[in-house]
Amino acid sequence: MENILLRQLENVLCEGMKVPEELRRLYQWIEDNGFYEDREGIRYGYLYPQQALRDSWTDTEREGGTIISFYADSREEQDETVTRYYGNKDEEISSRLCIFSQTGAEGSMGALWLDDEGETRIVHLGSGSGSTMLCTLAQNGLDFLRLLAIGYDEICWDSELPLPPNHDEDELFVNPNLPFRAWVENTFRTTIPELGTEIVTPVQMGEQESKGDSFVEWSNKVVR
């Protein structure tokens, strides 16, 4: 059976860009479990069945672990989005960024970025209206999955990443997505960190100190 999520992404990849193997396997896991919805010709993939998540939501808690949606707009829409984001029409931007996920309800995005050495990295584009985190999310696909398995409500908030999930007793309690966590651990024979900052070094939009993040350095050069 065709993996529609993966085909959508492959159809809009920048030249020279590769889908990390771990992301390919995640998309297959999503398709195999039926964790997707089709709307207006686009397939959206999730880490947890959406109806079950909605049904579990109360004033105090919910199921499902990290909320993130995987999708791929057309290349034309991708180009428009990144041009608007950076305020720059230079092909240097559209030829190196491919948005593949929404990381926050306020519009933050996850993207594949082609670095100067031709390697594909996973980066974060904060919406600016909520999250202002603009940095590398993971150097590789496995670390991205490990980050998702920690169990934050969303991975777009830099203030949350140095702390464990559910550290604030006054906030909604997010029950961990144990099936996804177990799949990551068992499939890749890996462990899940306790804190997001074991993987991510958050950087804010406009911050000139790159903290050794080549994506931040590149973003600071191309933004207008």
Show the residue positions of the predicted features.
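Secondary-structure transition/turn motif
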Residues: 124-129, 178, 220-222
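A structural signal for well-ordered alpha-helical scaffolds and beta->alpha junctions
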Residues: 23, 138-141, 177
